Amino acid sequence: MLSMSNDRADTGGRILRAAASCVVDYGVDRVTLAEIARRAGVSRPTVYRRWPDTRSIMASMLTSHIADVLREVPLDGDDREALVKQIVAVADRLRGDDLIMSVMHSELARVYITERLGTSQQVLIEGLAARLTVAQRSGSVRSGDARRLATMVLLIAQSTIQSADIVDSILDSAALATELTHALNGYLC
């Protein structure tokens, strides 16, 4: 028999998956809470018990999705080379991700790119800072405040993801990965 907490987690997961499918199908700006509830097979009050509004669902969905991508691209070592390899692989995966690209072309993206750090960005900064601290101890990453370094790494990678399409005629996917690798290695040395 399932516990209520397992059922609740499953319902939350269904809601987030429904939100993701709505974003891919309609774009972030046209997603409604009613459509998310319909696709998840739950009532609107069920959704409201977990999230106060559609924007909160979008934030949770993005954080969950990015965490999933990070789990799919493992870190193969504690040094700068392994970390840069993972960052480049994650950036490549996110550039080709329908959900992320749908979000990038929305009003929501403008908020998280120009006005404030979102939860997923903060999680990435904290995770990167922890990994950079380990790499600093081994001497493969230069000294400095790990959170500041992590924030700059996030800005470099985020800019690459956002701008990849507009420079595709100059930097195809492989060349972009090579140049991002050089940029990150140069910054972190």
Curated annotation (Swiss-Prot):
Residues 32-51 bind DNA. Keywords: DNA-binding, Transcription, Transcription regulation. One of its GO terms (molecular function) is DNA-binding transcription factor activity. It holds the Pfam family TetR_N. Disulfide bonds: none annotated. Residues 9-69 form the HTH tetR-type domain. GO terms for biological process: regulation of DNA-templated transcription. InterPro entries: DNA-bd_HTH_TetR-type_CS (IPR023772), Homeodomain-like_sf (IPR009057), HTH-type_TetR-like_transc_reg (IPR050109), HTH_TetR (IPR001647), Tet_transcr_reg_TetR-rel_C_sf (IPR036271). PANTHER family: HTH-TYPE TRANSCRIPTIONAL REGULATOR RUTR, MYCOFACTOCIN BIOSYNTHESIS TRANSCRIPTIONAL REGULATOR MFTR-RELATED. This is Uncharacterized HTH-type transcriptional regulator Rv2250c.
